[in-house]
């Protein structure tokens, strides 16, 4: 029996591979079932190689959280900073909820672990507040409401968006049409708050 020849990867590529496999395993089997040994087996590498890159399970999970957080909030802020159009802002937020739902909910899983989440320090809450403030500021500008009212409106819009994304993940259908319908539903609801 021939053993497949393993390909030697660069340090960055191997680290990315291990983080990708970790993400897949957690989403598929749950965090409690995840072990470094399972990661090694599924990644097709030795246990010592996994520990060469990540000395502990905690370090691995923190690295995964940092990567996923940076990607998620980095891409979200980039997209939001490229538009002043309120409808486009709402569309971005709804699309992000659909992306999160279809790609799995790795961020909430990892953020719920205090020892893992501490890797973000104050950056995590600051990024979340910044994104939230962009939506609140956009609502204030578009509808001429107070900050307090805009926060309520943002919460309602967010709940609608999340519910639409969760429903789509179960029922399926045309993704873009469903996103557009959710955006129109949100905009219609927000209209009721106009002065």
State where each predicted segment sits:
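N-terminal intrinsically disordered/low-complexity leader segments
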Residues: 1-13, 194-195
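Short hydrophobic clusters on alpha-helical segments that form packing/core surfaces
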Residues: 14, 18-26, 68, 97
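Helix-turn-helix
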Residues: 17, 25-59, 63
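Solvent-exposed, amphipathic alpha-helical segments
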Residues: 21-28, 71, 75-82, 160-168
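Hydrophobic alpha-helical connector segments
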Residues: 63, 67, 77-103
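Amphipathic alpha-helical packing segments from all-alpha helical-bundle domains
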Residues: 70-74, 117-144, 151-155, 180
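Hydrophobic alpha-helical segments that form the core
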Residues: 96-99, 147-170, 174-189
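Amphipathic alpha-helical segments used for helix-helix packing
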Residues: 98-122, 166
């Amino acid at each position: 029996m021939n053993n497949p020849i393993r390909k030697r990867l660069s340090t960055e590529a191997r680290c990315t591979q291990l983080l990708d496999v970790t993400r897949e395993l957690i989403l598929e089997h749950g965090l409690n079932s995840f072990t470094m040994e399972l990661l090694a087996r599924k990644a097709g590498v030795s246990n010592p190689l996994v520990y060469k890159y990540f000395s502990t399970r905690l370090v691995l999970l923190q690295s995964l959280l940092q990567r996923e957080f940076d990607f998620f909030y980095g891409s979200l802020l980039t997209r939001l900073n490229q538009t002043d159009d309120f409808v486009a802002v709402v569309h971005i937020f709804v699309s992000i909820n659909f992306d999160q739902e279809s790609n799995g909910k790795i961020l909430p899983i990892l953020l719920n672990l205090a020892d893992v989440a501490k890797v973000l320090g104050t950056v995590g809450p600051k990024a979340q507040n910044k994104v939230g403030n962009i939506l609140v500021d956009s609502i204030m500008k578009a509808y001429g409401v107070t900050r307090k009212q805009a926060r309520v409106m943002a919460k309602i819009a967010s709940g609608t968006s999340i519910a639409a994304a969760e429903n789509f993940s179960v029922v399926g259908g045309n993704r873009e049409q469903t996103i557009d319908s959710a955006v129109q539903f949100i905009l219609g609801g927000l209209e009721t708050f106009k002065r």
